């Protein structure tokens, strides 16, 4: 997989290309990265790529020509069809399902905005999709781009040492992950649940499913509304709800 970022701050991406599982996978050649600085495509000696907005208003707007040239340069680096994504609070929310879809693609180009925004004409002509990481605003698109990259790369075969880690993550199965424990057996008076030390894999699997359902019901009940429950999940969920009704009564 090739991922390119159109950004005026290429160095920010060192954190994801050099460290952690994504950095290791990058060194192993599982995925490649290139930062494309639109300043190199500016039509002025000083490398300006922004100007004042027509109609007035605060801040500066990133101009379409240098961004378009940077995107076209990025596309030319691969024979594979590229998907161009603009990280924007106006985009559709990034979900696990969307990350899984993007992980199947060979070439992503991530457009990182700055200042007050980007000329709308560039978005209409050069961007395939806008994606948001949440209902809030940050100073630029670089951090959202790296969050998207991390979410996508985890799902690319070979990036994680054990793909089961990704399969057990929250949202991968449509519900939240269960609690996890390691040594010591007791910490500040709290012991590791006995079932996890039993060695009975069937009981452990059922406990983990029950805990995932319980946590999802408490923290993200909206996820359960979208989920088609299998009989075991329905039975466990009804038991959990019955317990909650008894506590409230």
Curated annotation (Swiss-Prot):
UniProt-listed Enzyme Commission number(s): 2.1.1.228
CDD domains given in the database record: TrmD-like (cd18080)
Residues given in the record as S-adenosyl-L-methionine binding sites: 113, 133-138
Lineage top rank: taxon: Bacteria
First-level EC class: transferase
InterPro entries found in the cross-reference section: Alpha/beta_knot_MTases (IPR029028), tRNA_m1G_MeTrfase_C_sf (IPR023148), tRNA_m1G_MeTrfase_TrmD (IPR002649), tRNA_m1G_MTases_N (IPR029026), tRNA_MeTrfase_TRMD/TRM10 (IPR016009)
GO BP annotation list: tRNA N1-guanine methylation
GO cellular component, one term: cytosol
Pfam family, one: tRNA_m1G_MT
Transmembrane portions of the chain: none
Catalysed reactions listed for this entry: guanosine(37) in tRNA + S-adenosyl-L-methionine = N(1)-methylguanosine(37) in tRNA + S-adenosyl-L-homocysteine + H(+)
GO molecular function: tRNA (guanine(37)-N1)-methyltransferase activity
Function, in words: Specifically methylates guanosine-37 in various tRNAs.
Oligomeric form and interacting partners: Homodimer.
Name the UniProt record assigns to this protein: tRNA (guanine-N(1)-)-methyltransferase
Species of the source: Neisseria meningitidis serogroup C (strain 053442)
